Amino acid sequence: MQIAIIGTGNVGATLARGWAAAGHEISLGVRDVRQFKGKSLLEEKNIRAYPVAEAVSKSEVLLLSVPPDVIPAVARNLSGVEEKILIDPSNAFRGRPEGYANGFEALTHLTRCRHLVKAFNNTGYENMAHPAGLDTFVAGDSEQAKTVVKQLAEDLGFAHCYDFGGSDMAPLLEQLGMAWINLALIRGLGRNIALNVIGI
């Protein structure tokens, strides 16, 4: 699958490596290919860097892994994403997009994407690199998009990817991510914890 990733911080880089290792073709959307600082990513098989517009145009799936407060600026410069699968992994921990409650709401209004999903926001990037036995979740109105993202989660090695509901459940899924942040970072349990669904 052709996957574009905008934002190569911890989450974006980790997912890029994981999906590339699973055989997906990863296009990193960057401002300046020549001055891109993540050169180590480009040493990985199946990962290449392109200008943002080119990376997006090549993709079937787009992961927008940038801080929530810059999502509006990035989203306003995206074009041709209405029919792509757009993944929002953001949690508004250190700032919100101006004029919006969260990144998902901003992307809904600014991109008009029909296949927007919330996913990969409920655990730390270290766990995303080694997710065996861990659960993750996806929310959105597009059943097609959720099916694809569930498969992408399995490709990374997650044990399960649960359907969390429609777009109206995206804010609640973000709160689940905030719960992980609270336990891991604020309450001091450490980043190597996970929130799993366990039947009793």
Which stretches of residues belong to each language-model region?
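Structural/interface elements that position substrates and couple domains in central-metabolism enzymes
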Residues: H24-S27, K37, P97, A159, ...
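Rossmann-like NAD(P)-binding element
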Residues: N46, Y50-G80, I85, P89-A92
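A glycine-biased structural micro-motif
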Residues: G38, K58, G80-E83, C113, ...
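Active-site-lining helix/loop region of Rossmann-like oxidoreductase modules
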Residues: I6, D135-I200
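Short, well-ordered alpha-helix to beta-strand connector turns
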Residues: G23, K58-E60, C113, F158
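Rossmann-fold NAD(P)-binding glycine/threonine-rich loop
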Residues: S90-H130
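NAD(P)+-binding Rossmann beta1-loop-alpha1 motif at the extreme N-terminus of oxidoreductases
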Residues: M1-K39, K45, Y50
